[in-house]
Swiss-Prot record:
Keyword Protein biosynthesis: no
Recorded GO MF terms: rRNA binding; structural constituent of ribosome
Lineage summary: Eukaryota, Viridiplantae, Streptophyta, Charophyceae, Charales
Name of the protein in its database record: Large ribosomal subunit protein uL5c
Gene Ontology annotations of biological process type: translation
Compartments, record wording: Plastid, Chloroplast
InterPro entries found in the cross-reference section: Ribosomal_uL5, Ribosomal_uL5_bac-type, Ribosomal_uL5_C, Ribosomal_uL5_dom_sf, Ribosomal_uL5_N
Role noted for this protein: Binds 5S rRNA, forms part of the central protuberance of the 50S subunit.
Gene Ontology CC terms: chloroplast; ribonucleoprotein complex; ribosome
Protein family: Belongs to the universal ribosomal protein uL5 family.
HAMAP family assigned: Ribosomal_uL5_B
Organism per entry: Chara vulgaris (Common stonewort)
Gene name tied to this protein: rpl5
Amino acid sequence: MIQRLKKFYLDNVVPDLYQKFEYTNIHQLPYLKKIVINCGFGEASQNSKFLEGTIKDLSIIASQKPIVTRARKAIAGFQIRKKMPVGVCVTLRGETMYAFLDRLIHLALPRIKDFQGLNWKSFDGYGNFHFGIREQLIFPEIHYDKIDKIRGMNISIITSCHTDTEALHFLTSLGIPFDSRDSFSTQER
């Protein structure tokens, strides 16, 4: 079964992008490559219960089992030894990616207190968008009574766009809410 957001992309976003950017080939159209969700846990890396809780929460949110990221080298100042777990990461592609983005846009982001939209300055110059979430409680799958600690996470939306302007228009047409107080068109990128 095709995801709702993917169907919206094919039916509404593709014709809009064809008209706006005047593509000559269907392969020039921007698309979502992947979504990467990363959750680092710094000083709590010595606690195995914290690692298990983070893996459980992220697997519930992403509907996919995350991998444990480990330190490449020892850093004495941060009390990190080589191969010590320092975070968890999950990469979403295909139908799972569209399902997660649909839940993020329509269920999770509106639950953030005083949410004005995402900051459009978080583009990296190559058409990819990165932002952070302070707590996992905004996702409806996470129950407040069953968490041991509030965790934040970084979400990276990787697109095939070549410029930030193209990516902003693409992600806006998908429904991602951007902050309208500081307009993108007035700034030079």
